[in-house]
Amino acid sequence: KFEAPKFKKKLNLPKASEDPKSDGYLTARQIDSTQFYFAKHFKKFVNSLKPTFDSVKYDEERIIIPLYYKKNLIGLQGRAVNPNPVKYITVMFDENAPKIYGLDNIRGDAPVYVTEGPFDSTFLSNAIAMCGADADIDKWGISDPIWIYDNEPRNREILSRIERTIDSGAKVVIWPSGIDEKDINDMVMSGLDVQSVIKLNTYSGLEAKLKFNTWKRI
C-alpha cells in the first residue's frame, strides 16, 4: 500500500513557459506550457531530489512532467527537448506510488479517460495518463475508466494491450479508419475535435471486439 510521504518534495524549477526552447516546443504542439516545468540540467536536478544517476557528465535539458498524489510530488517524467533516443525518463520517489499523471485533477466517480501520454491527457476533460505499464487504477479511486491507446493498428504491443483491456470488460476507444494521426496530440494539431471522436468511438464487450478486429492491421 502507498501512503503519501510526510516530507514534501518541491519543484524549484522555472515553468516550461519561461524557457524559450521548452515553451516553443510545447506551444508548437498546442500544449499548455504553464502546466509543466523545465530543467536545464535534468540529471543534476533529479539527483537533488533522489540519488538516481551515478554520473551527471552528459547532462541535458528536459521538460519536467510532475506526478502528484494528494498534493504530494511522488515522481516525475523528463521529456527530451533535443533529439534523444530516450524520449522519456520516469523517476519515482516511492516505487509503490502510482505511475499516473493527473490523479489530483480528476473526479474518480465520473468516467475517466486514460491516455498513453501526459501531453495527450491535457486535451481531454477528466483524464489521466499512464507513465508506465497499464496500472491497476481501481485502487486509486477510478471506477469507470475509458482506455485510449495510440492509433497504431500494426503495433503488436498496443494490440495486445487493447485485447487485454477488452477481455477485462473495460471500455476502450477504437479509432475510426479515416483517422491517420498516431496520437491525440497529432489529431488536435490536424484540427480534429478529439473529444467528440472519442465519445462516438468508445466500445466494450462484443462490440469492442468486432471494432478492434476491423481496426487492427496484423
What would you call each of these model-derived segments?
Residues 1-64, 68-70, 106-107, 199-218:
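TOPRIM metal-binding catalytic domain and adjacent DNA-binding surface shared by DnaG-type primases
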Residues 4, 16, 28, 39, ...:
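A sequence-composition feature that detects small, non-aromatic residues
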Residues 4, 8-10, 28, 73, ...:
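Generic secondary-structure boundary/loop-capping signal
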Residues 19, 23, 73, 181, ...:
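Alpha-helix initiation and N-capping motif
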Residues 30-31, 75, 128, 188:
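Generic short alpha-helical hydrophobic face used as a protein-protein interaction/packing hotspot
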Residues 48-144, 158-159:
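Phosphate-handling DNA/RNA-contact segment within nucleic-acid enzymes
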Residues 86, 108-112, 118-218:
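TOPRIM fold recognition
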